């Protein structure tokens, strides 16, 4: 069992953490993956603390997690295949259920995020890398001052009344919206 009461777990090689080794977030904890490495974990993450993904490597979460705090991406890639990989759905709107400082969220199967699960940008850019043939649907509000970049050939559907203020860039795949607000707050004057 691994318990975070603060501090950092740093991984220096690619490997799979035994799924029987539960992770408890008594307080905030950081998982730092070194460059070019991948940590895969399919066990349960529980507790009320926040979990931060740091380091330029990749963290793969595949468990039905019950943690109630925020998930933060500071750098590198967080890879998921289900909303449950991010923990319990908030009972009411949480603007920071998923927080980007920078880094990438990679989606390997179609995922729908509940409208109570808000996403906030605190850094310069948030990358959404959606694999081919899959869709990430964000029903909550995306807020903050950072930009959004769409990567991967899959589809990103933005259904919320989003308030983020920087640019939206499509490098690959599709972004689907049903209203202007899907692309965040409109500029105060024309821009190009």
Can you say where each PLM-predicted feature lies in the sequence?
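Beta-strand repeat architectures
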Residues: 1-39, 46-60, 68-136, 143-157, ...
């Amino acid at each position: 069992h691994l318990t975070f009461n603060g501090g950092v777990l740093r991984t220096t090689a690619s490997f799979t953490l035994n799924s029987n080794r539960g992770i408890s977030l008594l307080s905030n904890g950081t998982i730092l993956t070194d460059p070019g490495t991948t940590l895969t974990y399919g066990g349960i993450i529980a507790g009320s603390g926040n979990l931060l993904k740091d380091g330029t490597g990749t963290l793969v979460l595949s468990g039905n997690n019950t943690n109630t705090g925020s998930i933060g991406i500071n750098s590198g890639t967080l890879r998921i295949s289900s909303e449950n990989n991010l923990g319990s759905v908030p009972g009411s709107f949480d603007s920071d259920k998923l927080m980007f400082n920078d880094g990438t969220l990679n989606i390997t199967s179609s995922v729908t995020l509940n409208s109570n699960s808000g996403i906030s940008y605190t850094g310069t850019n948030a990358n959404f890398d959606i694999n081919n043939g899959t869709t990430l649907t964000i029903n909550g509000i995306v807020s903050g001052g950072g930009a959004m970049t769409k990567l991967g050939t899959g589809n990103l559907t933005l259904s919320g009344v989003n308030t983020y203020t920087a640019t939206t860039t499509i490098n690959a795949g599709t972004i689907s919206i049903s209203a202007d607000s899907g692309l965040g707050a409109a500029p105060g004057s024309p821009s190009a």
